[in-house]
Every structure is written in C-alpha cells, then in structure tokens.
Amino acid sequence: MKQYLELIQKVLDEGTQKNDRTGTGTLSIFGHQMRFNLLEGFPLVTTKRCHLRSIIHELLWFLQGDTNIAYLHENNVTIWDEWADENGDLGPVYGKQWRAWPTPDGRHIDQIATVLSQLKNDPDSRRIIVSAWNVGELDKMALAPCHAFFQFYVADGKLSCQLYQRSCDVFLGLPFNIASYALLVHMMAQQCDLDVGDFVWTGGDTHLYSNHMEQTHLQLSREPRALPKLVIKRKPDSLFDYRFDDFEIEGYDPHPGIKAPVAI
C-alpha cells in the first residue's frame, strides 16, 4: 500500500487549509488517482489494522439495498451510528440508490443487477456504471454519497473497476473504501467467471482532518508489510447470496490499530 502512504505525504506537503461541513478543518488536495493490481494482493492497509468485519458487513448491507443500521448492529458494526436517526434509518443512501433508484414513473432500477447483466451479456459496453449521486434525493440522505460513481471495464478476461470519490477522509475512510471496492470487484468477477484486474481510485476533495495529524505521522513512520490474499470459499448462486463467512483474508499482518475521531 505504498500508494496510500504516498498520498498521505502529498496531502501533508501540498494540501491547502480549508474549512469543511463538520467544522473540523482539513488539509486538502483536489484530484488524485491510485491504481491497484488485484492479482498482486488484496489492497488492505498494513500500516494500521483495519476492521475487516465492518468492511465486509457494510458491503453486504449495501448489496441488500438496506438503509437501516439494524443489520449492522446485529453484526457488531457501528460505523454508521453517528448519522442514523432514532429509528436507525439513514434515508435513501447507498443501498437504496444501488438497488432501487426511483424513476419518475414510479418504477425502481436495480443498478447492481443491471451491471451484472451487462458484464455477462455485453462486457465491452462503456455504460457499465453505478451511481449513488441521486440529485433528487440528496436532501433526504443522512450523508451525501462520498464514493459516488463507479464503472466496470472488461479486457482480456479481467474485470477492472474505477471509483470516483467526491470527498475522501484519507486517514479513516479511504482504507475502508479501497478494501470495500476491491472486495466488490472480486465478488463480481467470480459471479461473471472473470479474473480480477485493476481497482482504480480517483479522488476529488482528498483531505486529512486537522485532528488526525498525530495519527497520520505515526502511520507514516511505519513500514508497509506484504499485502494479504483474499479467499472466497464458495460461489453463491448470486451476488446477493454471499455471507460474511464466505470471505477469508490470508496473511494479513498489520501494525496495531490507530484510533482517531470521526468528523460528523
């Protein structure tokens, strides 16, 4: 994950001090890209321990179209708690947009099912895209989508994906986002009988919060370790039938975790 540490250093060296919605303050750059060859290992940050349970369960939750944190709580995942209302609802966030984007005539579009069909039946299409940025429903969401738009690409029997992330918390959020989308590419590839290719991450407002600086410097002082390997133990009947126990990360030997406050 050398690219990730290089990004941290770039933000520290070149970032502009900016105010933000949370009132915390950031160092920010605009426009950055990283590419991860998924055949070379699973891109999980090793300079601090990442909470795999949260990463996997959150993705499974998205794929079910769920927008209430009850499922997450049942599985000891609390990463969405700060934004949920008293009933655990988040409004029409990622899961709703991925699986049931509303149309003006009252129908709903399952973008994930559509993408799966395209990958199987028209893999050379340049329209294999999922968007969570529904302008008509942004004001109903507890949090506007940060990872907003992603596109799949098939070449030489390999599946690649590029994500555009309009806002990126480099220290806390980005390691989760990279691992989550890498996991999704592996799952999609298995369902479509493809190998994995590259995951390309593109960031818009890419920032370090002012109250993450001590943690950031600690992380930069650590030497990256070898990337782990993702093992998917079975091939379910559909993308929507994966379970937490289907995934195993082999050889993950990270440095200790580093706690930092979440900007809300």
Swiss-Prot record:
Methyltransferase keyword on record: yes
Matching InterPro entries: Thymidate_synth/dCMP_Mease, Thymidate_synth/dCMP_Mease_dom, Thymidate_synth/dCMP_Mease_sf, Thymidylate_synthase, Thymidylate_synthase_AS
Active site: 146 (nucleophile)
Keywords: Cytoplasm, Methyltransferase, Nucleotide biosynthesis, Transferase
Pathway: Pyrimidine metabolism; dTTP biosynthesis
Reactions it catalyzes: dUMP + (6R)-5,10-methylene-5,6,7,8-tetrahydrofolate = 7,8-dihydrofolate + dTMP
Name of a matching Pfam family: Thymidylat_synt
Localisation: Cytoplasm
EC number: 2.1.1.45
One function term, GO molecular function aspect: thymidylate synthase activity
PANTHER family: THYMIDYLATE SYNTHASE, THYMIDYLATE SYNTHASE 1
Stated family: Belongs to the thymidylate synthase family. Bacterial-type ThyA subfamily.
Subunit structure: Homodimer.
Name used for this protein in its record: Thymidylate synthase
Organism of origin: Salmonella typhi
